[in-house]
Amino acid sequence: QDMFRLSGIHRDVYLVASPKVRLRDIHLTSQISDRLDKAELKVKTDVHNYGKKVQEATVRVSLLNTEGKPVSSFIIPTGKITGGQENVCEGTTTIRDPRLWSAETPSLYTVQLELLDAAGNVLEATSQQYGFRKIEIRNNKVYINNALILFKGANRHDIHPQFGKAVPVESMIEDILLFKRFNLNTIRTSHYPNDPKMYSLYDYYGLYVMDE
């Protein structure tokens, strides 16, 4: 393949300290109505009990709009979690007239999750930005939010002329702004996944991604 192969640790490596009961994984999906006037957000969480005793908790989910104002909040009970096991917990909420994400209007909501113990104390908190979008294929053509999309893009290698594969965030942003100035709306991550931080930047600045 047309790339340089470099050895060593070139992306973030870190340890995570967590409570014995924690949010091990979070999965967000949504359904947009045909008229684009309603969005249903589905939150799926894997809550793991790393301790030995049976535990029970709740997950509090808050949805904030693009200005950071709360538009919805709901509770997901975890049920009793046996020591060393995890429960898969799901919940949904619906909002009216969502601001939809596209490459031209990259509107991002914030989904906040808090894991609460039986006494209501916060054990863990995390957040994830999320863009509501409706993606369809009709007659071999791609529609996003009911609009026909022409993908204009380029390949991108995750590499820097000075730092190799340890690409600084400033260089990532510089690449994205260059793509936008050239009126591109799509990036193909040839031939491997980009640094995880890149996907947050793609969402923030508004670029479609063909991920390899």
Regions found by a protein language model. Give the residues of each.
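Secreted/periplasmic carbohydrate-active enzymes, especially glycoside hydrolases
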Residues: 1-196, 201-209
